[in-house]
Amino acid sequence: MSDKIAIGIDLGTTFSCVGVWQNGKVEIIANDQGNRTTPSYVSFTETEHLIGDAAKYQAAINPTNTIFDAKRLIGRDFNDQSVQSDMKYWPFKVINVGNKPYFEVSYQNESKQYSPEQISSMILSKMKQTASAYIGKEVTDAVITVPAYFNDSQRQATKDAGRIAGLNVLRIINEPTAAAFAYGLDKNQDKEMNVLIFDMGGGTHDVTLLSLEDGLFQVRATSGNTKLGGEDFDNRLVTWCVEDFKRKYKTDLNQSAKALRRLRTACERAKRALSSSTQTTIEVDSLFEGIDYNVTLTRAKFEELCSDLFRAGLEPVEKVLLDSKLDKSQVHEIVLVGGSSRIPKVRQLLSNFFNGKKLNETVNPDEAVAYGAAIQAAILVGQTDEKLQNIVLVDVTPLSLGLETAGGIMTNIIDRNTTIPCKKSRVFTTYSDNQTVVTIQIFEGERKFTKDNNNLGTFNLEGIPPAQRGVPQIEVTFDLDANGILNVTAADKSTNKSKNITITNNRGRFSEDQIERMIREAKEFEEADNKKKAAVDSKNELENYTHSVKQAVTDPSNSNNIEESSRSQIESKCAEIMKFVDENPNEDQGTYDLRRKELEDLWNPIAVTLYAQKNNQSNQTSTESTGPTVEEVD
């Protein structure tokens, strides 16, 4: 059995989760706060950067420097329509750096800029630390999940984030596929079962239809919307409340980032409450300019505000049924994944779509993706547990891959939902007479024109013998591996001249030097965190030691054994140190250690004397009580 350990990480828009395969099962690992999911938040202050729960606590008091939703920006251009529409809801600043979105924050009183990959790497680093602390040694091998409908840019950017975090990313896998592992691991299914995974999370929505039989997980079709999730429902509630506040108090909340952040937190809480009750109150004390705000929100009103978004959640369901050529009656199980799948209206619409079919709630919606990623990680590092032996995953490519032909037309070579790995070829010809060079432009997407799709790369095949248009035969081959890496070859059949390119989507990605710089910065963050922790530990030890010395020196039982001048000097030193700690909470470890030594130099000689005196008293008492233990009987 392999003794290598690898972890599975669900890098979520709003929450992240990590799991590991141990002792024949998946363990979902709790963080240092005891929570099994960690907020995907990073906060920057004058003294430190915080990740997870501690960062989310900062959101209300430090909104402009507390970053969330990095997943909605990763791998996207600044001018992307979804980036521009999301920006108006964020209290933090997003700037344009080479048509890439960057977060601008104040950290240690300096203006700093961080890419979505860097913020994501900090969250991944937190998950890595959480797992390493639980396992008892550093873990670097990991499987990271992404939405099934993430394009190549977003997948590669996520992989870069993992590398910056110091992880060896074994594989990037689709979230609903991972959730299918969580559902199907213990199912001894000898008859084929069609399972639909409905995954609606905080920022993205995926639907995958797969068949499950004897440990074979065969993805039939996948679809989704990378701009639909719980955050969008929160946005609708925030907009509604802002308008309500303006109507009631003639004041625009959009003036205050802090007020909007507090309102968003209250709206998110109300949304969750409406999953179990039909009415709740959005209430925020002193929201803006001293005004206490409260409004009643019914489930019916919430459903009305988000009705178009809820209906949009069914579009990928229709698409996967169409692509897989299955009727809805042929779907045996509908498995719910992601926090937003708890919303009653979402469940009702989904059940009604399948003619009232009961939905499967056997997996934990918040943990299923990390659970499945941990299974895949264990398989990839060669864990030979019997339960893992027969599991085989056959996945598909979520987007069509092709090239541009005359008129800017997208001509597919590999259609979406084609099983991977795969290899496909098509023959093309020249467009002009005596054309000696052919430009191969590679795209992914479903639109008819390449300008509306995602450009993956370009190369030229030269040295084609001059001939009339339509005569040369150029064979173009697309070879897509299990990791989704595409190799494209173009060959002139008459001369056997060929050229190829491996698509790693360098367009818009970081250079090797940039990634190395980010890795160094991540290590600097880690070193700073370690120094900060050491300083906090030293400060706590100084406080505890000072309290114990003060307690000892003022103990009535020691009053006869300590000279008044010494007692006064030590009490004064204790008061001085406690005042210093209160006024200087952010000093380095060495400073706190030095203050402790000052107190030790005063107290230790007295402590030694006290110990010796008490020891002598104990010995005397013991001697005095020693005597005959029997009495002579006459």
UniProtKB/Swiss-Prot annotation:
Gene3D superfamilies in the cross-refs: 1.20.1270.10, 3.30.30.30, 3.30.420.40, Actin, Chain A, domain 4 (3.90.640.10), Substrate Binding Domain Of DNAk, Chain A, domain 1 (2.60.34.10)
Protein keywords: ATP-binding, Chaperone, Nucleotide-binding
Pfam families registered for this protein in UniProt: HSP70
InterPro entries: ATPase_NBD, Heat_shock_70_CS, HSP70_C_sf, HSP70_peptide-bd_sf, Hsp_70_fam
Keyword Transport part of the UniProt annotation: no
Ranges for region Disordered: 611-634
CDD domains attached to this UniProt entry: ASKHA_NBD_HSP70_HSPA1
Compositional bias (Polar residues): 612-628
One MF term in the entry's GO annotations: ATP-dependent protein folding chaperone
Keyword Chaperone included in the entry's annotation: yes
UniProt xrefs under NCBIfam families: PRK00290.1
Family: Belongs to the heat shock protein 70 family.
Summary of the function given for this chain in its UniProt record: In cooperation with other chaperones, Hsp70s stabilize preexistent proteins against aggregation and mediate the folding of newly translated polypeptides.
Stated name of the protein: Heat shock 70 kDa protein homolog
Organism name: Acanthamoeba polyphaga mimivirus (APMV)
